[in-house]
Amino acid sequence: MSPVPLKNAEPAHGGVRTVSVLGATGSIGDSTMDLIRAEPERYQVEALTGNANVAGLAKLAKEFSARFVAVADPARLGELRAALAGTDVACGAGESAVIEAAARPADWVMAAISGAAGLKPALAAVDRGTTVALANKECLVCAGDFFMSRATAAGAQILPADSEHNALFQALASGNRHELTRVIITASGGPFRTWAAADIEQATLAQALKHPNWSMGQKITIDSASMMNKGLEVIEASYLFALSPDEIDVLVHPQSIVHGLVEFADRSVVAQLGAPDMRIPIAHCLGFPDRITGRAAKLDLAKIGQLTFEAPDFTRFPGLRLAYDALRTGNGATTVYNAANEVAVAAFIAQKIRFGAIARLVEDTLNSWVRAGNQAPLGSADDAIALDQQARNLAATLLPQIAAKAS
Ligand code: NAD
Ligand code: MG
């Protein structure tokens, strides 16, 4: 008797995998290092980077015998050198050192810097034609179509590490592009899912940082509360899988167990499920095309009991609507969407604006940019970075009037 054939009879990967982790000191970095720590004989750590946490970075460098570490803050080189004294770990500081870390030879690179600051390092890895696990959605949103074209040109393989996109990536494998009718990414709805608009408007930083299911970095946690994160993810899905906005739906699913679903022409819907633990999509990327042993809890659906779903509310969460608008506008609008959101989130953290003003600042920045009529396709990383800077300046100009205006 022959069993039903499974995809690969033999593992595709033997031997040691060289890995680099950009943003090693963050939340995704931490989950990635946890998976590497579990099977140290499978991996050689090439390079690690962090922004300013020298002690954390040096600790990881020593534990994993990294060959090179980079801290983004150029003022911390002396501190990093001192922390690594007596080891043979090479080190550097500043943006160029982070880019150097990304460009060093590694079979697999985790791109987990937060924000558009991750774009140049991610591109440095992509340009080597290596495998890049992409957690840093802002870099994709900032670079637009251009990022994936550059990956294709370099022969790099992009593996989606964001949980929803990783779910889609897994589910998409069960059909062909022309058979796909739509994809659905789920959203927990965040801490304000059931709140009235007037209460969301006044939400405090502490309330925005209380995510019901996921433990993540500060920026993405605030983006989840505003649903800007889902907006960024709709754009991310569009660029990653070359989908039109009409082919991407969002479904609110408070339990965060079903992460993404793909609907095919025959009306089959294929979904990926798992505990809300980033180590699951990261493990998928780390092992790909094989599967490694995970570190997250096994899914116990009987214990969870109920999975519920609801339609997203584009009125209470205008950030989601704006993402579809930006995607339809194209020609750099998603770069502006991301940049304005980064400025707005920083202003909210600094308590310069109310929570409700985050989406207003993004909307005003987008409108003002569209009115100025400077839209053009992004042809290079420099175009994306220039537009990102232009949009940040525009958002900063609009910020005082948004801050002064009561809703
Ligand atoms: P985090 O804030 O915990 O970590 C960010 C990392 O980037 C840190 O190592 C930090 O030192 C580094 N960094 C920050 N600014 C930098 C700069 N200017 N230059 C160089 N390095 C810099 O964030 P996180 O939650 O780990 O998220 C990282 C990325 O992954 C984000 O793009 C986020 O949207 C995405 N993501 C995160 C999760 C999650 O569960 N945390 C899930 C999906 C996607
Ligand atoms: Mg996600």
From Swiss-Prot:
Under catalytic activity, the entry for this protein gives: 2-C-methyl-D-erythritol 4-phosphate + NADP(+) = 1-deoxy-D-xylulose 5-phosphate + NADPH + H(+)
- Identify the residues that bind NADPH: T25, G26, S27, I28, N53, N136, E138, G217
Whether Manganese counts among this entry's keywords is yes
Using the UniProt record, name the top-level EC class of this enzyme in a single word: oxidoreductase
Q: What name does this protein carry?
A: 1-deoxy-D-xylulose 5-phosphate reductoisomerase
Organism, scientific name:
Rhodopseudomonas palustris (strain ATCC BAA-98 / CGA009)
Question: Could you tell me which cysteines form disulfide bridges?
Answer: none
GO MF terms listed in the record are:
1-deoxy-D-xylulose-5-phosphate reductoisomerase activity; manganese ion binding; NADPH binding
Instruction: Please give the function described in this protein's UniProt entry.
Output: Catalyzes the NADPH-dependent rearrangement and reduction of 1-deoxy-D-xylulose-5-phosphate (DXP) to 2-C-methyl-D-erythritol 4-phosphate (MEP).
Q: What's an example Gene Ontology biological process for this entry?
A: isopentenyl diphosphate biosynthetic process, methylerythritol 4-phosphate pathway involved in terpenoid biosynthetic process
Q: Where, in this chain's numbering, is Mn(2+) bound?
A: D162, E164, E233
Against Pfam families, the record matches this protein to: DXP_redisom_C, DXP_reductoisom, DXPR_C
